[in-house]
Amino acid sequence: GTGKELVARAIGLSRFIPYEEKTGRFASDFLAAFHPINLSALSETLLESELFGHAKGAFTGALQNRKGYFETCGMHGSVFLDEITETKPEAQVKLLRVLQTRRFQRLGEVQPTRFEGKVIAATNRDLAEEMKAGRFREDFYYRLCANRITTPSLDEILRDSPGELKHLVEFVAGRVAGLDEASALADETCDWINRKLGSDYTWPGNFRELQQCVRNILIHR
């Protein structure tokens, strides 16, 4: 709700201009791969299959070889591990090893594959508390957190900069109704928010709640 994936995409989908040795030119346009995965929605086996890939017959239902996200993201790509604190310590050990060695193995295979991309992780929990409770490994934390970004809640943003509401609503309106309708829809939404919710509203649903406000105004126009 605070826009963790938007921040991750902004980092992961950075444009590069790689040099192509075969042609002796720089690529005219290159967009890095971005693979988001919600760790709270997957079992341990399925998580390993999604990230590492698997060989045919590695487990029941593995009918063919499959590349995982660590392999398909390529040299400039990113794997976004959302809700990283939902992983069990056993899975954290395996992910730690990938970060340390830059290598992994598909399920059912012995030959290691090199990981050349980057890992971006996110959580809405207090990592210090998770480590203190023994649910999150300290060694994994220090290997993972090379750079840390805290995404503020919508309430924090608007308390610091009340004028940002119109800008954020216009952004959401553009995505919901298109650029041609964005300005008018944003004006209607801001007017409704000021009349019905007031300037002291704390937005417990964060950006998802703001998006729903814009959609409701669009539906009832």
Regions found by a protein language model. Name each.
Residues 17-31, 63-66, 76, 106-112:
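Nucleotide second-messenger and two-component phosphorelay signaling modules
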Residues 25-28, 35-43, 83-84, 153-155:
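A short hydrophobic beta-strand->loop->alpha-helix junction that borders the nucleotide-binding pocket
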Residues 1-32, 36:
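Walker A/P-loop
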Residues 13-17, 48, 57, 61, ...:
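Conserved amphipathic alpha-helical interaction elements at protein-protein interfaces in regulatory
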Residues 10, 29-32, 90, 108-118, ...:
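Nucleotide-binding/hydrolysis machinery
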Residues 37, 122, 149:
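Short glycine/serine/threonine-enriched helix-capping/active-site loop
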Residues 4-10, 41-53, 63-102, 117-121, ...:
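Conserved AAA+/SF3 P-loop NTPase catalytic/coupling segment centered on the Walker-B
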